[in-house]
From Swiss-Prot:
GO molecular function terms listed in the Swiss-Prot or TrEMBL record: asparaginyl-tRNA synthase (glutamine-hydrolyzing) activity; ATP binding; glutaminyl-tRNA synthase (glutamine-hydrolyzing) activity
Enzyme Commission number(s) of this protein: 6.3.5.-
Gene3D superfamilies on file: 1.10.10.410, GatB domain, N-terminal subdomain
Enzyme class: ligase
Gene: gatB
Superkingdom of origin organism: Bacteria
Subunit structure: Heterotrimer of A, B and C subunits.
Species per Swiss-Prot/TrEMBL record: Wolbachia pipientis subsp. Culex pipiens (strain wPip)
Name of the protein: Aspartyl/glutamyl-tRNA(Asn/Gln) amidotransferase subunit B
Amino acid sequence: MTKENWETVIGLEVHAQVSSKTKLFSSSLTEFGTEHNTQVSLVDAAMPGTLPILNYFCIEQAICTGLAISAEINKCSYFDRKNYFYPDLPQGYQITQFFEPIVKNGKVFINNNEKEIRIARIHLEQDAGKSIHEESKTYVDLNRAGVALMEIVSEPDLRSSAEAAEFMKKLRQILRYIGSCDGDMEKGSLRCDANVSVRPNGSSAFGTRCEIKNLNSIRYIVQAIDYEAQRQIKILESGGEISQDTLLFDVTLGKTKVMRSKEDSSDYRYFPEPDLLPVEISQDKIDSIKSSLPELPDQKKLRYINELGINEYDADVITSDKATADYFEELIKKHDSKIAVTWLTVELFGRLNKANIDIVSSPIKADALSELLDFIVDGTISAKLGKQVFDIMFETGKPASLIIEEQDLKQITDRDQISEIIDTIVNNNQDKVQEYKSGKTKLYGFFVGEVMKSTKGKASPDVVNLVLSERLG
């Protein structure tokens, strides 16, 4: 048998850090990159006698996320203790939601909305701390301990690493649009565990799955799933059996490695958290949060196509990232969507890609580009000169108005002035005039070029064409 004879089955458990200034059960801050152990309260350190106090903002963000994926909101959920020992888990247990999660039965669409990936549940839980290993010592940083996570659990509906990657991108897009998670995988605020198994094509039974922990980039998700699927296929084709293990992905070697044998839920001895009351959510609260949801990416894309006449490809590019969509929205407040799309996707994206920076870090903000488009639309400068101004704006950060003034780039629209220039060019090139009149109409471009050369590109193309047509007959 070959790889083509096997089907890969994948389910993802995505850990999304809630965009909250404080932790799930304490008032400690959640800023990234601070000094070790500087954002730790007595609750986070599990000092005796301390009690958790629920951060209700995190509840609202979980509800918001559930509504964004058309899920059911559990009107009465509660927290449980997941018991296990690890050096960076001060309590000796994690507060999570095992029996009654806050969100159930959602869906995310991939493959151009043609395939539905079911979401089994979203529950809130605490993050653990971080172990920092040196040669002979291990240090523990509790800054991350107690940070609120949403664990978003998909059903095993994914069938390839490419689908898993697209699912992660789509989920991250939704989270960023609603603002419940910043989706920054480099900072660890979005990561996932991948449950991978294989089965013969046509089989409905699931194979033995292995869980690959803590994948923190789309590229690693793809590499880890591809390697693990191939590893399992080789074992099965050689007559072996798959052991249900928890794995780590070695990014240097590009291989999965056994971390430990996979535990069952009974190993964690779950029981209800005695220090927290059940979380009761009214329908009025759910309706209020639903009414405050922003326009989601799929809705925005359809609006751009149906109402603004943008083609599907450009609409997809613009809505793929919330910051890009916000930038575009600022442009179309004053300008036609066609000119806005061109300057955003061609001019700005071209320079951003070349400079290897994202739109958030762009030296040209939306209001600055909008001002430049004002000058092009009202004829102050030509589109060609607009690109020169744009380049200077990108390099210096100066506004278009200042550059136009400093460079003396205002378009010449005075008919008499342009007529005088054209008369001089026509008189100096009578041979070309005769050739043009005898049928060599391509010479028209020569005369336009001479006018632009004489005016350093500042002559209004419309006025030039009008006067030149009269002169050449």
